Design a protein with these regions (language model features):
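Helix-loop "lid/cap" segments that line or gate small-molecule binding pockets
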Residues: 112-120
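Cytochrome P450 C-terminal beta-domain/meander region
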Residues: 151-169
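A short core secondary-structure module
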Residues: 169-213
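Alpha-helical interface subdomain recognition
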Residues: 11-104, 120-124, 131, 135-136, ...
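A short, Trp-centered hydrophobic/proline-enriched beta-strand micro-motif
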Residues: 135-146, 186
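Flexible, small-/acidic-enriched active-site or ligand-binding loops
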Residues: 150, 154-156, 174, 205-240
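A generic local secondary-structure boundary/capping motif
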Residues: 128-130, 147, 156-158, 172-176, ...
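Leucine-biased recognition of intrinsically disordered, low-complexity hydrophobic segments
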Residues: 2-4, 19
Length: 398
């Protein structure tokens, strides 16, 4: 019989893996337990399958429930209705989301959009952050363009002066959860050439603004995304987030927070896959014995367990890296964590499917759904080639 112990980060009351290495206070531990109970009581694969087949791809009641738990404002300032937490608190939420495979605009709203508005400050932050913390406002960030290949500074969308404001023209791609967003943060070029770092300005655009057209679709993991065309979209000067021409720094900081958050989500998903595969190997019989008694498969499960532990370390490292003041060191640590998470995620997903045999490929089994999500995480905010190049450049700059 397979003798590997249960994952050390399992809540014995409900079997939900969690990132206990992230916990620094008793409040964080209780928060994580509340999230685990919430998802265990309200969300599972059959429910998820129904939700992803309908619009908007998630249950608004679940969204309100998360807001009531304080998840939406966990990293937002207390002055604007948040909890004043940081990367570790966000990691706790994202770890629980990864374990449950909960699909929603949480990343785009609370982590990316809310973080950008908070960093930009001013009237926009005071006006919108309290509603985000209460779960009453959802955001999307249109950080990608068709030609950009993960380069945030590659912005062809233009923002030209138009009376008392600006006129936006351009295209954005794979804008996460734009279909359910109340407003979209749009980077546009107010000065400079297409790949210049200076000259990018962030605008908060109401999702129903005339000239903003969407083509909505589902991604392979059941999330929602849109390709957006901006045709003469008019916004006032009050829509500018932060400083004119200085939006790239806000966007890059948001992407790094997004990577750290996704690392925690991936670690939670991998923990679930390990537990599910371990339980299957202890019950599935072949040749008159449970397959967990076969030494070759035990060795593979040890590798999966080791990968899960390494993923937790990578997630913790990414959260810690957000506090690094040196840009080159921060870039190196964030990209290093992303490379590690992507590699480990592929390994754990592939092994979990293979160890389940043919049924591992079916839609009825949960492991395939987690594998798809890990695949999408691997492609978010830069793939392996992009982050290898970024890591190398940061090493040379050190």
């Amino acid at each position: 019989m397979l003798s590997l112990s249960k994952h050390e980060d399992i809540d014995e009351r409900n079997g939900v893996p969690r990132l206990t290495s992230i916990f620094r206070t008793d409040d964080q531990k209780m928060f994580a337990e509340s999230l685990a109970r919430f998802f265990a009581a309200n969300y599972d694969i059959p429910k998820r399958r129904k939700l992803v087949a309908s619009e908007p791809g998630y249950d608004p009641a679940h969204w309100r429930g998360l807001a009531e738990l304080g998840a939406m404002g966990v990293a937002l300032p207390e002055a604007h209705g948040g909890s004043g937490g940081g990367p570790f608190d966000t990691a706790i939420v994202m770890g629980a989301i990864g374990t449950s495979l909960f699909g929603s605009p949480y990343l785009s709203t609370a982590v990316l959009g809310g973080g950008i508005l908070d960093a930009g400050g001013g009237v926009l932050a005071a006006r919108h952050l309290p509603a985000i913390a209460e779960g009453k406002r959802k955001l999307s960030v249109a950080y990608a363009e068709p030609q950009a290949r993960y380069h945030l500074e590659d912005v062809a969308t233009s923002a030209r002066p138009d009376g008392a404001g600006y006129r936006l023209e351009g295209k954005k791609s794979v804008v996460l959860h734009a279909s359910s967003a109340d407003a979209i943060i749009v980077p546009a070029r107010t000065a400079g050439g297409q790949r210049e770092r200076r000259g990018i300005t962030l605008f908060l655009v109401d999702a129903k603004t005339a000239g903003l057209d969407r083509r909505d679709y589902a991604t392979i993991d059941g999330q929602r995304a849109s390709d957006i065309t901006l045709s003469g979209v008019r916004v006032g000067k009050e829509a500018v987030i932060g400083e004119t021409d200085g939006g790239l720094a806000l966007l890059e900081a948001a992407a790094e927070r997004g990577i750290a958050a996704l690392a925690a989500e991936a670690a939670g998903a991998m923990g679930y896959l390990y537990e599910t595969t371990l339980a299957y190997m202890k019950t599935r019989k072949q040749f008159g014995a449970t397959i967990g008694s076969f030494q070759a498969l035990q060795h593979r499960m040890v590798d999966v367990f080791t990968a899960c532990e390494s993923a937790k370390s990578a997630a913790l490292g990414a959260a810690l890296a957000l506090g690094e003041r040196d840009p080159a060191a921060r870039a190196r640590r964030i990209s290093g964590a992303k490379l590690q998470i992507d590699k480990l995620g592929r390994h754990v997903a592939q092994e979990s499917i293979q160890l389940h045999g043919g049924m591992g490929m079916t839609d009825e089994l949960s492991v395939g759904h987690y594998a798809k999500r890990l695949t999408m995480i691997g492609l978010s905010f830069g793939d392996t080639n992009f982050h290898m190049a970024r890591y190398t450049a940061a090493m040379r700059a050190a």
